[in-house]
Amino acid sequence: MDDEDMSCTSGDDYAGYGDEDYYNEADVDAADDVAVTPTHSEEADYECLSVNQVERVFIDGVNSLVSRISINEKFARILLQANHWDVDKIARLVRNDRNDFLRKCHIDAKPEPKRKLSSTQSVLAKGYCSVCAMDGYTELPHLTCGHCFCEHCWKSHVESRLSEGVASRIECMESECEVYAPSEFVLSIIKNSPVIKLKYERFLLRDMVNSHPHLKFCVGNECPVIIRSTEVKPKRVTCMQCHTSFCVKCGADYHAPTSCETIKQWMTKCADDSETANYISAHTKDCPQCHSCIEKAGGCNHIQCTRCRHHFCWMCFGDWKSHGSEYYECSRYKENPSVAAEANHVKARRALEKYLHYFERFENHSKSLKMEEELRDKIRKKIDDKVNEHNGTWIDWQYLHKSVSLLTKCRYTLQYTYPFAYFLSATPRKNLFEYQQAQLEKEVEELAWAVERADGTARGALEAHMHRAEHKRQTLLHDFFF
């Protein structure tokens, strides 16, 4: 695709692109006539840009700053990156104390006490590189700080910093000097090394995009598109090239009603705890008498705690002596008795149980979304068959396609209510949220039941299910997300 043709806006038609996206809003836009009209948009106002188009965005930002303050373009980029491309903020800080601000942004060096050099030292200083200890150079590259080093040492320094992933913050080699090298300076040093130059430009683009609040790399696999949004909010964008959808603020999967900070905590916790939690949940229980954690080694349900010697049933936690005759086929369930002062390991078990409660439901809805993709394919085939049999047109049966798309949308939102609820403090607000969550879950499952039995469900009844589910979803998002 040509760079000039890559630009698109969020108003473009994405219909049909969302086959692998569980939350493709475009798929259900046409269902709005049977659902609730949202008062807030979950879709960001954005456009998809190529690298060349993004470079023009950077140039416009530099020109805007240069027109406001008297500064060289190469330093304007450093200022903009350090201040998240906020031209007004930079202009204000420059007016307050220009010299101090430029030092804080690593453009000017901190004042150094002047040292008196001997005549021999003065001669050497003019052509001497203190890194390689070679002299005789007629010209030594240097930054605004004036510290001179030979081109070979500069190149080695640039390569070293690039190997560490640093591009826009390559500093002077002088000890304790914090002046940054502008991109023009670095490119002049590595101009004869195309491989290093390519790596530097790639890393520099990464740093520039990451510093810009309205730019975000598409998270699709090896996708070159860069998204530019008009607002920095956790809203959904869809790449026009690879059709990947994600949150434009944090780059994660779209996660309403959960915030970016909360979903990051949740995903970290899942990555750290899930395998351990699953094993502990499946293989261990607490002794009902001393609350020690016990791992069951065999198939027998008669357990003796090694700590307190208490005999109990693995299945129901009942005292083994009074358990009855059906020792090995116990079907009773009894919760652990509450204790006034829980030991640390008991508190850990309670925390684990809480985590598993939310994690299992989060995962269950994720699995349901995958299975409902198969349902989507079946409904598409069903519609095609009916149309081919001259039993109505695609428009006549489109409501079936809309129903599964809306089901997907509602279940996706429901899935992300569980991380939100996990981190929510026990307050009246949480009670309200859990009530609305339960209402949404009820409507989602009723809609799923109706969609799976679409042949036996009248169109009016199915559309009523769709309306109720979307109404509950919008109400929850309005109260806890927008």
UniProtKB/Swiss-Prot annotation:
SUPFAM superfamilies hit by this protein: RING/U-box
Binding site residues for Zn(2+) 6: C313, C316, H323, C330
UniProt: Zn(2+) 3 binding residues: C218, C223, C239, C242
Residues that coordinate or bind Zn(2+) 5: C287, C290, C305, C308
Protein residues bound to Zn(2+) 1: C129, C132, C150, C153
RING-type zinc-finger residues: 129-177, 287-316
Entry similarity comment: Belongs to the RBR family. Ariadne subfamily.
Name the record gives this protein: Potential E3 ubiquitin-protein ligase ariadne-2
Top-level taxonomy: Eukaryota, Metazoa, Ecdysozoa, Nematoda, Chromadorea
